[in-house]
Amino acid sequence: MSPTRAGRLLYERACEVLRLLEETGRQVTAIGRHDREGIVLGLTNGFANVVGRDLVLHARRDLPTVELSVVEERSVVLVEALERHEVDVALAYEVHERPGLLRVPLLEEETLFVTAPDSASRRRAKPSDRGRGRRGSRPIKFAELVTHPLVMPGPRDGVRQQVLATAKRLALPLQVTLDVSSVSMMKNMVARGDAAAIMPYGNVIEDIRQGTIVGRRIADPPLKRTMYLVRPMSRAAFEEEGGILHLIERMCRQYVDTLGELATPLAALRDGALHAAATTAA
């Protein structure tokens, strides 16, 4: 089912009106804040763990006219917050096409199979392996992964949905023994050997570096997900549009560098085309 020409025209004009209203609201708010533009940026836990601090510090130093607020949530929650206009722009994973949202794919990232370390693996691992974590062990095949009891986040989580879909496609049974929506609780249970898990590297980066959790890449097939910059089409452009997008691009590049072989930049990030792609409908 596709909209008629009249319907498309009405939608486009409605977006124009909403942008004008949004821009007026921003200007009025900026006057009340002594010309500081308020922007709410949504990030996932893993991304915030890796570059969140640097992002906030760079924003404070390089964007003095911006009052940046950061919201940390799961991707599905961030998308819903965008649609309610509680968040202005977000970096979220596996965002499907939705009316009124502009999506720009930024990078592709592998998730890891994480377990508690045993004493033998600790003795075998070199200090450099423990520091990097993710390269210290051989990859695990998906068919082997499913033989382990798993702790997984709730049904709406993107990683869980991907794991279940892959297992179904390969006709492999899963041993999901625990449903836990808390990242810190999942990591605690993995570290204590209660179960294994499939998690983004950013969520367990410090645990792997400290040796309390071991991360292994997943093969046959690897589990990959795409990070998008997402913003409402009805939102007016930021007054510091160029500065905000440059900051996001810079932090995404830093994130890719930190993940190394686990992340691949896509065209908008790789070719420096984020500003053009992210302002297409703004």
What are these regions (language model features)?
Residues D62, E73-H148, N203, P222-L223:
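Acidic, Gly/Pro-rich loop/turn segments at junctions of secondary structure
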Residues S2-R33, R250-R253:
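Alpha-helical "hinge/linker" immediately C-terminal to small N-terminal DNA-binding modules
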Residues G38-G42, A90, V151, A197, ...:
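Short, well-ordered beta-strand segments
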Residues A6-R13, V51, L55, Q162-V163, ...:
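Short amphipathic alpha-helical coupling segments at ligand-binding clamshell hinges
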